[in-house]
Amino acid sequence: MNLDKLFHLKENHTDVKTEVMAGITTFMTMAYILAVNPNILEASGMDRGAVFTATALSSFIATCLMAALSNYPFVLAPGMGLNAYFAYTVVLGMGYSWQQALAAVFVEGIIFILLSLTNVREAIFNAIPMNLKHAVSVGIGLFIAFIGLQNAKIVVNNDSTLVSVFSFKSSVSGGTFNTEGITVLLALIGLLITAILLVKSVKGNILWGILITWGLGIICQLTGLYKPDPAAGWFSLLPDFSNGISIPSMAPTFMKMDFSIVFILDFVVIMFAFLFVDMFDTLGTLIGVASKADMLDKEGKLPNIKGALLSDAVGTTVGAMCGTSTVTTFVESASGVAEGGRTGLTSLVAAILFGLSLLLSPIFLAIPSFATAPALIIVGFLMLTSVTKIDFNDMTEAIPAFIAIIAMPFLYSISEGISMGVISYVIINVVTGKAKEKKISVLMYVLAVLFILKYIFI
């Protein structure tokens, strides 16, 4: 098989080695979803083992589609935030069964497919102004960095200031130095190691940073510096093969959708919430990562975006059938792009690893969050550099861009950043009389109105 011709590697100024490293890196930075998603959906009453298999399988299928239909280095998996909405709001909060929630996700996926085939999502992507697209990239960078700081527990909750820096003297979560403290220290060391590797232009610097940090953690565990305490949430860093190699059955969740919810008034609200967050998280990720990788053309459009959007839509539908919440394009795809990934070969490698994770789950689940956190922080820095592309000389462009940027990390949502960016862009340009001069797309006005209505009624 000629991978160069299949994925147009030379045209995209990349090679097989770079793409493979990028795919591995992306997978490593988002492998946590294999552990986190089952934990979250289990709260809704779903079988943990079945959800693990559904998570890995739906990620594999959706990411393979991304490689085949778009030839872009984007990787898909059940989205964080959407899974929490599924479990804690729809099921535990509103009282619906997880089977009914899966039906809502399935219907959302079907609508997504129709929207993708009719170019609606592509039109939305193209309607967003270039400066706002660069702002989305920067905002996602800050958002990723903040997630990394949280995963490393460098940033912790604070009742007075909402967040504060971790203290080795007093842990807010009740951990000790040998459980929590040492992992924070390892994350900081890992951040410095990854930064130095980046400065030295070491190939695969982000992946090496993850592996070295994990390796240091294993050494700390073997020497007694890190003491696992599973009951308190501090797990062993060594892969556990005590149960051998087996794939958990997906039977408890496969095709268990209950469509009786379709006839309930709340269904429209539930489905729209899934639809809205999935659509604009995906668009935000595509805009941000593609902008950073210089994949956008001179008009700010992403060639062959339809294939990427269709892969995302089909992934959501397949995910619901398997038994998991909404599948979406992961912002961690930026880590692979930062490693030089530019084609579908990157996503194919990540997809294969998701497939292998079904058999080698003990290895992938042993990679701790403190080892992947430095990678997220560094990727955040790399995406932040797009701020230089924003036109700060034009306040009608700069202020909406600023609002979009700060909204993402502060509101912990890519879609909220896009919403506020679009609303502020339209209002500021209309009031200042710049709208006609800039020929703002009609679709931007429609989006602004829809976003305002969302804040009023949802």
Where are these regions (language model features)?
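Helix-loop-helix hairpins and the membrane-proximal interhelical loops
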Residues: 1-50, 169, 210-305, 449-453
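Helix-loop-helix junctions within the multi-pass membrane cores of secondary transporters/permeases
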Residues: 2-37, 58, 79-88, 92-140, ...
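Alpha-helical membrane-protein architecture signal
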Residues: 13, 17, 189, 268-272, ...
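Hydrophobic/aromatic residues within the transmembrane alpha-helices of Major Facilitator Superfamily
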Residues: 24-31, 64, 68, 145, ...
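Loop-to-helix transition at the N-terminal end of transmembrane alpha-helices
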Residues: 45-64
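Juxtamembrane transmembrane-helix boundary signature
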Residues: 59-80, 111
